[in-house]
Amino acid sequence: MSVEALLLLSFGGPEGPEQVMPFLENVTRGRGIPRERLESVAEHYLHFGGVSPINGINRDLIVAIEAELARRGMQMPVYFGNRNWEPYVEDTVAAMRDNGIRRAAVFSTSAWGGYSGCAQYQEDIARGRAAAGPEAPELVKLRQYFDHPLLIEMFADAIRDAAATLPEDLRAQARLVFTAHSIPVRAANRCGPDLYERQVAHTSALVAAAAGYPEYDQVWQSRSGPPQVPWLEPDVGDHLEVLAARGVNAVIVCPVGFVADHIEVVWDLDNELAEQAAEAGIALARASTPNAQPRFAKLVVDLIDELRLGLPPQRVGGGLVPGYGSSVNGALCTPDCSG
């Protein structure tokens, strides 16, 4: 299938203090989140000057993708659109239409299936095309890539690099802990069932094996919403308490659920969890995310080549866990994943 452009589609984030509350209102629209809760979350962004790292990382990734496209002799413009902040996907798709783009691949900055990881991006695609009108380009979302060999390799290398920052006498006994964003149990059960959890668990197992860790833990982080609504557990903070009670004195935390340093990584892990670990006497090392590594750009262009050349998907682990291929103009990733 021929494509003329790439749209990098992401979550979005504020880029100044005055943008924080409007951004959070966009994220939570229709969910009835109290103003007090939004103001509390806003403090996380304001700690970093009101700037989320995600937009800057995505712009750097686009530069890396453009370099990889050029290296392969592929002439293809790369566009950038977001769900919750500028540049909004609606504006970006309109610009693609005005530039004469007829068909483009879409890479979303989530490796996973499920509603928030995949189907919500399909909604973004459909909304962007609807806003652009009848001349909107055809948009083909690239497949889920949770088991792509380069993703596994990047996280495995990041774990080894994180381990090297621990005191030498603690490295061999450090406990490896994988984290991913928690979601409501009800939402998890609607997509698969347990599709998201199985994909995360599969990726964690592949990364642990590649990094040389036969034992590890899989936990969740960054839950929100009413306490009476069950979310995926255990929480990373609660698990750290369990490890401290067992006498564990060194932990490597790998945010395998994130392909970039979202605020949930740089605040929830690098600040809150780090403070908790220090109080418990645990040496904590956090593995980096792919961010804008050249290897991540290569992964993106690999996915484009799979689409345009009809190549078989590169998957580690024999495809034992469901992964869904490309879809067109906002089709659902899997029939059960309706929201």
From Swiss-Prot:
The organism's place on the tree of life at top rank: Bacteria
Places the protein is found: Cytoplasm
Broad enzyme group: lyase
GO molecular function annotations of the record: ferrochelatase activity; metal ion binding
Keywords: Cytoplasm, Heme biosynthesis, Iron, Lyase, Metal-binding, Porphyrin biosynthesis
This protein's record includes keyword Metal-binding: yes
EC annotation from Swiss-Prot or TrEMBL: 4.99.1.9
Gene3D superfamilies in alphabetical order: 3.40.50.1400
Record CDD domains: Ferrochelatase_C, Ferrochelatase_N
GO terms under biological process: heme biosynthetic process
Residue positions binding Fe(2+): 181, 264
Annotated Gene Ontology cellular component terms: cytoplasm
Reaction catalysis annotation: Fe-coproporphyrin III + 2 H(+) = coproporphyrin III + Fe(2+)
Pathways per UniProt: Porphyrin-containing compound metabolism; protoheme biosynthesis
Coiled-coil segments on the chain, per record: none
Main localization category: cytoplasm
Residues bound to Fe-coproporphyrin III: 52, 121
Family that this chain belongs to: Belongs to the ferrochelatase family.
Cited function: Involved in coproporphyrin-dependent heme b biosynthesis. Catalyzes the insertion of ferrous iron into coproporphyrin III to form Fe-coproporphyrin III.
Protein name: Coproporphyrin III ferrochelatase
Species of origin: Mycolicibacterium vanbaalenii (strain DSM 7251 / JCM 13017 / BCRC 16820 / KCTC 9966 / NRRL B-24157 / PYR-1)
Lineage: Bacteria, Bacillati, Actinomycetota, Actinomycetes, Mycobacteriales
Name of encoding gene: cpfC
